[in-house]
Structures are given as C-alpha cells and as structure tokens.
Amino acid sequence: MGRLVEAIIASILLSLCFTITKSAPKSALITNLPGFNGTFPSKHYAGYVAIDKHRNKNLWYYFVESERNASVDPVVLWLNGGPGCSSMDGFVYEHGPFNFEPKKKNSHLLHLNPYSWSKVSNIIYLDSPVGVGFSYSNDNADYTTDDTKTASDTHTFLLEWFKMFPEFQSNPFFISGESYAGIYVPTLAAEVVKGHKNVTKPVINFKGYLVGNGVTDEVFDGNALVPFTHGMGLISDELYEETKLVCNGTYYTGGQSGVSKECAGKLKTVSDTVNLLNLYNILEPCYHGTSLSALDIEFLPKSLLTLGKTEKPMAVRKRMFGRAWPLGAVVRPGIVPSWSQLLAGFGVPCIDDTVATKWLNDPAVRKAVHAKEEKAIGNWELCSSNLEYRHDTGSMIEYHRNLTLSGFRALIFSGDHDMCVPYTGSEAWTKAMGYKVVDEWRPWMSNNQVAGFTQGYANNLTFLTIKGAGHTVPEYKPRESLDFYSRFLAGEKI
C-alpha cells in the first residue's frame, strides 16, 4: 500500500513538472545568453505581451523560474523606478541570476549569482511603462503617460501574462520595486485588488508587496533629509537646532505656501554642507568629473554633482544614477522632468552604465531575449528619454492603508545610508499609519550578524532597515537582501 501511495505521489509530481514544460510558451524560452557558457539553473523566458493589439502597444518582460520549486514558489513582479527606468537595472545590477564581469572588449562574462532572488521565487522583470527599455508602441501618444495609466497597463500585462503561463496562476503573487516604484507598487496593487472585486479573470493570487527606499508622500519624503543628515553626523548640532527652530520642525510643507525665508536659508546651508556626498550612498566615494566646462558647472544644478561614481567589488557599477525622482527631489503632482530634459545641452558627470547598455544593445543578446531590433525600436537605455510622465496619484499613504487593512502583507525596507529617499521618511510614515506595534524595534540577523533593524505593526505592515546599504539595497547587500526577501515571502519572522 505504501509503495502504491509513493507511486501516485511521484506520478503527480511528474505531471506537475510536465505541466510547467508544456504550458509555458515555447517561443519565449531562452536557450542561450551571450557571455554565459554554463547551464541555466532554471528556465528563463522573455518576450512581449500585447496590452493593446489595435495600437500595437507591447510590454517586454524577462521571466526567471525559481531555482528551488517553480511550481509552488511565489511569483514576484519586479519594477525599477525612475519613473521610466528599465527593470533590467535590477536584473543586471541587483538581484538577477547573473553577476556581470565587464571585459575590455565589447563582450561580458556572466557568472551565476549566489544571491539571486530566483533562488526562492519565480521573478518577472518588466520594462514599464511603454517606452521604457524594450517596451514600445506604434503610437507615440502612448509615451505620454501617468501613474494611473501605468498601473492599468501593468495590470493588463499581468492578466495576459498569467494566461500565457497558466501553470503559475495558483502560485502566491507579490509585487516589488524600489525608488519611484514606491508609486508603481501600491497603485498596481490597488488595480489588482480592484480586479478581484470585479471578478476579473484570471484571478491573480495576490498576497502582498515590497517597497525599497520608495517615494511615498511629498511631505514625509520632504521632511526626511534634515533629521537624516543630523542623525548620520553630516551636519552639526548647532546647524540642526537652528534649522529645527526657524522651521518649527517642518522642513517641507507642500502646497503653495512653502517655508519661511529664514527656514529656506537654513535648508540651503544644510544642502550646501552635504552637497559633495554621494546622494545614493553616503559611504561611497563621489566622482566629480573634470570634463565639464566652467559654463556647464555654473548652470548645472548643484545636486547633479552628488551623483556618485562608485567602484563595487565586481567593478560593474560605475555610478549611481536614475533610480529616483530626478535629482532626488520631492515627488510633487504634475509632470516629472526627464533626465534628458534636465540635462539638455550640458555634459553629464558620473554617468556610466556601460555594462547593461552594451550588453542589452548587443544584437545577439537582443535576439536571445526576443527583443525587437534596434532599427525597429531604437537602442536600449537604462532610463528612457522617450517619456512624458505625470505624477497624478498623490500620496501613497491611503493606498498602503487600504491594502494592509484588506489583509495584504507589506514590507517597507530602506538602505540606511541612502540620502535620496532617506529611511527617516519611510520610518516616519509607517509610524504615522497609527497601527499598533506588534514587534518592537529590534535588530534582525543575517549570517549571524546584525543586518539592520525592524519594527512590526498590526495589519501586516513591517518596516525594515538594511545596515550600510544605499538606495539600491540588493546591490550593496545581496546576501542580507536575499535573507529578508526569503523570510518575507515565506511569512516568517525577519
């Protein structure tokens, strides 16, 4: 009898494996990648999903099956910020299946990443909105978009994607992202929940979401810098106390009134004091190029000079750029200026994404990942110069409240050395939700070391810091990131 049961179980497991092989679109399967000579630890797929066939409007994705158990592990959508930056940024530089070793020639060597998030999850890297990365439309009007349209389009993508990959419809589904994805993630989550209420098919088995160093609310984000710079020892006690006094403890008000003249003066002093630091990780060196003319330097916004050029251990990342609201400014309603608009006519310091740019513009790579040729849709850019983007959804606080009160789990994580979207803002708004503290502030551990600190709230909300990390947390702390990511997805205590 026991052998019969074992045989039945084995047959079921075999049929599940066969289902995955059979159901996934064969045309999307990636069979090789230039630069990688080994065996993929799991299946990779890439291609386009038409979200509007009449307009030939298409979103491009790269899907990595879990290396553990694809049939039951969560499916996670990853979104980079910008707005308008490709999620292949996360694939190449943060938590994708490969580490990229740049070569002096045009080729790159790819090595397996021991801390890839595909170790424990199926993960979709999506170029969104249309006009970003390899995503495109035949109608240029589609390159004028906003938060609301982006959320709707991405929801349409998900519905179509799960039809293409029906074997994953029952898997737990999570949405994740960083920086301006602090807007993308909750607005998309709200669309998914709305789809549940409208009984939209297929039903997405949505369980929760993760946001890293995400822009959220203009007042909370705007008030984060001064306490961050003081807490990090970047400004003096005297300057902090003087600024706090003349500003009445409020450094950004939003709306039309603004702050007093005296407060504005002190805030400028704070800004000037930290001006030469690396905006995206204050521990990293900041490269100040010598190629700029005196005229360029005079007219460039000072904060541009804080865009850091860093040397990582793998020597892949040469700078930190384009992950957040331009220049690290507060997210305000209205049109978001693109980098190309801000920098028209000027030399740009500290910008070097040669690894991702060269690799993804290699015709052999584009063919391997089923992307359109350059002559059809143009070259791949880390952050698109094609978009006109409008922020139209306001504060994310109510989105988070509605989602968490509806039973969806939320992890708000912050690299504690990011000055672009400081952890102080995220800590403040999560506290201001008013939920009961159910897990008092404490250290969390990775590899038997303190990796940061966390505080848990009622209604499924967790705030987490990552010690020593900058704006793109998995890039700086890959092992620690995989640890908190794995625990959160599994519903375990971090």
Curated annotation (Swiss-Prot):
One of its GO terms (molecular function) is serine-type carboxypeptidase activity. The keyword Hydrolase applies. InterPro entries: AB_hydrolase_fold, Peptidase_S10, Ser_caboxypep_his_AS, Ser_caboxypep_ser_AS. Expressed in flowers and siliques. Belongs to the peptidase S10 family. Its main location: secreted. It is found in: Secreted. PROSITE patterns: CARBOXYPEPT_SER_HIS (PS00560), CARBOXYPEPT_SER_SER (PS00131). The active site is at 179, 418, 471. This is Serine carboxypeptidase-like 21. Residues 1-23 form the signal peptide. Its EC number is 3.4.16.-. The gene is SCPL21. One of its GO terms (cellular component) is extracellular region. GO terms for biological process: proteolysis. The keyword Disulfide bond applies. It comes from Arabidopsis thaliana (Mouse-ear cress).
